Amino acid sequence: MAEINNERAVERFQAMLRKRTVSDKDGNFDREVFASYLPMLKEMYPTVFEVVESQLINEFGIVLKWKGKDSSLNPVVLMSHYDVVGDEGQDWEHPAFEAEIHDGVIWARGSIDTKGLLAATLEAMEKLIAEGYTPPRDIYY
């Protein structure tokens, strides 16, 4: 059984959080930062991206399809997002984009909503694929 390297998982999560993927209500965002996100994920989770199909949607949206044993079964759909709101005018106890660890807690914008879910899902997929697991049905993420 493949082991999850917790230290490496935390480092990858911190890297995700340190990317300032800020979008505002007016649709303003830094295109370079968003364009760098998928290549970063591919580098951090090479096993996932060797096995799953990935598709860009509207330039920065990412859809992954992990083909299961029986595609006639209804698929599972998991969702998250990696854009965050900015930290301007907010009083953060720790810098919002440094992903610092204090008392066992990672402090960063997006750590709960929802880069944490993105990281957890990719870590699980990386481990399961390394073990040779194929899901019983297709999984979209």
Residues covered by each model-derived region:
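Acidic/His- and Gly-rich active-site-bordering loop/insert found
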Residues: M1-L118, L128-R137
